[in-house]
Amino acid sequence: DSQWTYREDLKTEEDLWANFRYILEQNNKDRLDGEGLSDSEFEQVKNQLQFSSFYKAGEWLVGENGKVMVHVQRDMEKLHLVVMNHEHIAGGSSVYEVINQYKALKSDDEDSTDVRDRRFDVTLMINGLPMIHIELKNKQHSYMDGFWQIKKYIGEGKFTGIFSAVQMFVVSNGVDTRY
């Protein structure tokens, strides 16, 4: 029985943030005293997950003492919320999800080279965070077409926001696969 759940309902950035928020709140009920995050508190979380590079995201994902945390100021108290616990990998409170056909919207910035919406093939998420991005091609195309597509998406700024946490890219044409 697979631990991975296919989430056909997650297609937009808003969907992904709402899903991440739900998982974060579920995994931190004790720290939140049963009270969900307010919108302003969740904005604090989102701001901490705007990584300037995949490397910076990787540094954060190492965590401290096996726990990856975000911090939220609530009234006079600072809450330390667990995003991932390395002890719970492959079990425990970890949530594993698969999405496909995610719609990465074009930029509103007039000066951007990002001129159109894009659809990502497959993404694997852990606790609501996109970790592995997969581009698939058919056998008539080289797996390198997937590589160039990812490179184009990076240049267009598609891997920002919640997708700035991605740690691995996989390309495949069904014959050759690279990561």
Identify the function of each model-found stretch.
Residues 1-179:
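An alpha-helical interface "stripe"
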